Each structure stands twice: as structure tokens, then as C-alpha cells.
Amino acid sequence: MKAYERLLSYVKVFTPSSEETGTSPSTQYQFDLARLLVQELKELGVKGADVDEHCYVYGHIPATRGYESRQKLGFIAHMDTVSDFCDHPVTPVITPNYDGKDLALGTSGRVLSPKMFPHLSTLKGRTLITSDGTTILGADDKAGIAEIMTMIESLNDNTIPHGPLCIAFTPDEEIGMGPAHFDIKKFGADFAYTLDGDTEGEIQYENFNAAKAVVEFAGVNVHPGSSKNTMVNAALVAMEFNSMLPSADTPRDTEDYEGFFHLYSIKGDVSHATLEYIIRDHDAASFDVRKKSMEHITKILNEKWGKGTVSLTITEQYRNMKEIIDTCMELIEHATAACKECNISPLITPIRGGTDGAQLSFMGLPCPNLGTGGHAYHGPYEHITVEGMDIAVEVGLKIIELFYK
């Protein structure tokens, strides 16, 4: 079976994660896909395939003869999708021989256009897969799952000698909780790759340092007709706080290795207001400066409006895995060589986000990220090509071959 055929099946399984439930997994939907994958793994001959109580799927592929004592290599992808644009099941749409031009997404009124996504012109002649424009597609990261499954099927012909291989599919990656209950010992790998990137040939081992900031504002609410020198409008103080951050340090205005503050939630009135941010930077020193700048603004506003007006809570989320991967760069060398042998230019890019692999690397499992061939994740313009998925499978198999050469 081709990777894209598996993808078409997986995206029809509804698996959004949720930040609201506080459970693990965050949604029971994810078990629907997990059970399907366990069955497929068993049919492919994967040993010990099962799903645990937290919705982690594990399986193992025994080494070929003579390679039993070699290091164990793993491959990981996640089952959940974002909850945005995911209020009803996905309807995938296949466009053969895409012409590289504007493409209407069903009857949604949305148009996938090279004006918005310039890389589309390079996909001319390929078979494009999208949603109908009313939902995400779900290639993030069901394409990664489909590609790993296809790699497993290809390995069954025994033409690639390999050591013990470890497979895992995780829940709740999109809400940053993918590794929360990941059993490193049960998984068993010495090294692994996540298949959770964008274009085929992409190799990523640098991600953001990440934190979340919640800023609370306590106001003083009195009748506006008699409030001179008394009222403290929490909503206005919140606006003042945000105005003191660098105006160009936002996701819209940054790229590559540039960090940002992202204000993603505003709630409030005169009495109380809340701003919620994520703080991101690849450089650890710059990351610390960003956090300290928020602390400084909090201090300044409390001096101006009164002690306790502003309270700041910063929660660390994940760190840049580069410091771990730097100690085992052979993982990147194998991936780079694999791309070249598959006639694909390796594209080493920083991750402007995080992956399960970032956290797993600090848990003792070095885990860079590979591209799946997908684009425009987390929205209705998400798309992938059949050919890109085939290349991602080819690169993954070549990595296995080179790792055990």
C-alpha cells in the first residue's frame, strides 16, 4: 500500500487534542486511531504492538540476522491534530496533475493560491491532496504515521539489513504533552527520528526554547463619573503592558532564527484582565532576556499603578534540543546523506516551534525531526503531495540502511 492511501484512511479518523480537559490523553477520540494502528502493526508483523492507558502505541521490529546486537533506532509520529478547523470530519480531496495555479477548495470559498504559498508552483505536475477547505487535512502528523507504516511494509521484503527498530505513535503533541507519559524504557531505542516536519528532505535539530507567560491585571472599578485619580482600568493597563513589548517581535514579523512574543489570548474588563503569551527564541541567552523584559515591565507598571496591580507567571515549556543533538551529529549526517542518495537536496532548517523529539531528547532519547512532504499545517490550506510522501518514505528507508551500514 502507498503512503498516501494510508493517509487518506487516517485523516478520516477524528483526533483533535484539547487543552481544556486536563486528562491524558486529552481526548478519547485518539484511541480510535490508536486501536486501528495497533491492528495494522500486528498485520505487518510488528512485535508487541499495543496501546497503553494513556494512548501511546508501541511496537518493535526484530533485527535481521547478524544485526541483533546493534544499536536500536526508533521512528515516532503523533496521532492528534489541532482542534482549530476541526469541528467535523475531514473530507480529503485529490487533485491529479496539479497545474501549480489557484485551486478552489471544494465549495468552501477558500482558494489555495501560489500568491499565498509561493512553493505551490514547484508542485506542478504532482498529485496534490487537500481538504475540502472546511477543515484541516490532518497531514500533521498523520502523514508521518502513514510513512512509517509504509516503511515497515517495505522492510518486510528483507532487502535492507537492520538492527532492532522501535516504533511509537503518541497522543497530544499539538498541546505540548506528547512526551508526558512516553515510556522511554518500553520504547527501547538508543536514537530516534520524529516524522513531523514539512517538505520532503527537511532535517531539523534546532527548535525554540519555549515558555508560556500569563499576565494578570487587578483593577479598581468605581463609578466613571467620580473616578478621577481612583479608577485603575485593568484592561487599559493590559494594553499598556503589551505596548511596552517590542512591536516587531511577533510571529508575523519574524522568521528563521528570530524569536518573538506571541499574544494569543486577551480577556478582561475594568476590574480584571488577563493576557496570555508564548515566548520563543532559539538562542538561550536571548530567551532569558525576553523573560526578564517581561519581569521588568511588570515591575515598572506596579510602581506606576500600585503594588499587586500586575502579576506575571512564566512557565517553562521546552528547550532547544540542539545541545543534545550536537553530541550525536551522526544522526544528522545519516539523514543528510540519505537525502542526497535519494536525489533530494537536504534542507536543514530551524524548527519554529517544538516537536515531541525536543522533549524526548532531554529525556535521554536524541530525536531530530524529518519532513513528511506537507505544507501549511494547522489550517484549511494544509496540503501534501503523493510524490512528496513517497520521497519521505524513501529517505526514511535510506536512513535505516546507512545507520546500520
What are these regions (language model features)?
Residues K2-Q28, I129-T130, Y318, H378-G379:
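N-terminal capping segment at the start of a domain
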Residues A235-K405:
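Metal-dependent amide/peptide-bond hydrolase catalytic core
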Residues Q28, T135-A146, K228-L236, H383-D390:
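Short, conserved micro-motifs enriched in small and acidic residues
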Residues E153-C166, S247-T254, K405:
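Phosphate-handling active-site elements
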Residues L112, R126-A139, P171-E295, K299, ...:
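Midchain, well-structured core segments that form catalytic/ion-binding scaffolds
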Residues G22-R70, G74-I76, D80, T91:
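A non-catalytic alpha/beta surface segment that caps or lines the substrate-entry region
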Residues Y67-P161, F169:
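Active-site metal-coordination/substrate-binding segment of hydrolases
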